């Protein structure tokens, strides 16, 4: 994953921009950018911190929810629930 290859968030952002299949900017809470890749992994960046999520793994999704601040977690609640439900169905 890009976050593992690039500990520097600027380098990770540049690499993510080049290969992401989707980019979303969310301004709830501290604000963050999500890059989604074709292997169902997601890189989330906020300032100088980043989180790499495997959207096929419930623990990784829960870790993402924990990583978010309270306001962003509330805004992402339905997406987090959808991701967890899709993993449980598999």
UniProtKB/Swiss-Prot annotation:
<dbReference type="GO" id="GO:0098672">
    <property type="term" value="P:symbiont-mediated suppression of host CRISPR-cas system"/>
</dbReference>
<protein>
    <recommendedName>
        <fullName>Anti-CRISPR protein 30</fullName>
    </recommendedName>
</protein>
<keyword id="KW-1257">CRISPR-cas system evasion by virus</keyword>
<keyword id="KW-0899">Viral immunoevasion</keyword>
<keyword id="KW-0945">Host-virus interaction</keyword>
<dbReference type="GO" id="GO:0039504">
    <property type="term" value="P:symbiont-mediated suppression of host adaptive immune response"/>
</dbReference>
<comment type="function">
    <text>Allows the phage to evade the CRISPR/Cas system type I-F.</text>
</comment>
<keyword id="KW-1080">Inhibition of host adaptive immune response by virus</keyword>
């Amino acid at each position: 994953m890009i976050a593992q290859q690039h500990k520097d968030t600027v380098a990770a952002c540049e690499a993510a921009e080049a290969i992401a299949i989707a980019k979303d900017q969310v301004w709830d809470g501290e604000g963050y950018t999500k890059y989604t890749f074709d292997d169902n992994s997601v890189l989330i960046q906020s300032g100088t911190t980043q989180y790499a999520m495997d959207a096929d793994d419930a623990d990784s999704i829960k870790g993402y929810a924990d990583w978010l601040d309270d306001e962003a977690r509330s805004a992402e609640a339905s997406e987090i629930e959808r991701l967890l439900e899709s993993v449980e169905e598999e």
